[in-house]
Amino acid sequence: HYTWSVFHNPNALIALMGGNKAFTAMLDSVFALPPVFDDSYYGQVIHEIREMQIMNMGNYAHGNQPIQHMPYLYNWSGAAWKTQYWVREVMDRLYSAQPDGYCGDEDNGQTSAWYVFSAMGFYPVCPASNEYAIGSPLFAKVKLHLENGKTTVITSNNPQWRYIKALTVNATPNKSHWLTHQTL
């Protein structure tokens, strides 16, 4: 999982892995591999490992907070549709209003923060930057009341659709897969 922990420079990680195609294939493999694990480090099966098996999303273990940004990395490799697919899969399959509708544990609010950001349609892959990676908005309309007194409104034509056809900011087309904090 720590292979993907280059939050500050995904482009360098892509280059180290041989480019966009190889990087995307490596990301794909995380979701495709059988959920096999080695518990020798812990000496027992910890809950994150058991949850990874139950979730049936390959080796992606959403309950392990350091990997939660991983689906958003497809944005950097030219496969944004895969970000949208996997982010929505995680929201739909791993979160619900049931007693067991929350995987993993809540380390300083990270797991719930992932959901809140992702449901709004963006996520801060690198918390130390001013960029948010675009995902797949879950709501038809979200209003953010910012501390500067401004309100940002995010609308989705149909929250049932997980793929983004076009993104506009103040009626101007946005061709990138990121928003800056200043844009919000």
Which residues does each PLM region occupy?
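Active-site core of glycosidic bond-cleaving carbohydrate-active enzymes
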Residues: 1-153, 158, 182-183
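C-terminal beta-sandwich/jelly-roll accessory domains of carbohydrate-active enzymes
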Residues: 157-184
